[in-house]
Amino acid sequence: MKKAILIIASFAFLIITLSAFNDRTTAPGVGYNAPDLFLTSGDNVSSLKDYKGETVLVTFWSSGDALSRIRCNEYSALADRDDRLRHIAVNFDSNEALFGEIVKRDNLTASEQYHVDGERAAQIRLNYHLDRGLHSFLIDKNGVIVAVDPDVEHVNNAL
């Protein structure tokens, strides 16, 4: 009996010890490291890892999803007013010309806007679990997601 208790206690100690030293898994949820994101715009190639040490708001949007488009506009205006926040907006429209027109019409900051389609869009949707809707992720200076679809007040409090 003592041997069985010792084995169970040793196993429990081993599990607790190993879990204490594991890094957080990368996943698109609060408390997890944000999945990396590689984006291109013209000759410019950007990665989410390039923004380590900064607070970043990643917005996924489309012209067909009104809520995501409204959020993109709000977050873009917020980032324009506060230098402590970096905004990366990723658009999934199938028509890149439409994307360009919306950026102009909505007076969005073009340098923070990226258009993706095809396989690249499918991979991003998979990595960020966007199969049930487009979301925004507030990422802290350590690359950890601190909020999903935050309101402006939440973003301001995180800065």
Regions found by a protein language model. Give the residues of each.
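Bacterial Sec-dependent N-terminal signal peptides
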Residues: M1-A27
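N-terminal "domain-start" segment that seeds a small globular fold
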Residues: N22-L48, A158
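Short active-site neighborhood of thiol/selenol oxidoreductases, capturing the structured segment around
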Residues: S46-I70, Y75
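Hydrophobic beta-strand anchors of alpha/beta hydrolase catalytic cores
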Residues: L57-V58, H87, S136
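Active-site-proximal beta-strand/loop segments in catalytic clefts of secreted hydrolases
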Residues: F60-S62, V90-D93, V116
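Structural microenvironment flanking redox-active thiols in thiol-disulfide oxidoreductases
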Residues: L67-D106, R120-R125
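Short, internal strand/loop/helix patches
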Residues: G100, K104-K141
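Thiol-/selenol-based redox modules, centered on thioredoxin-like
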Residues: R132-L159
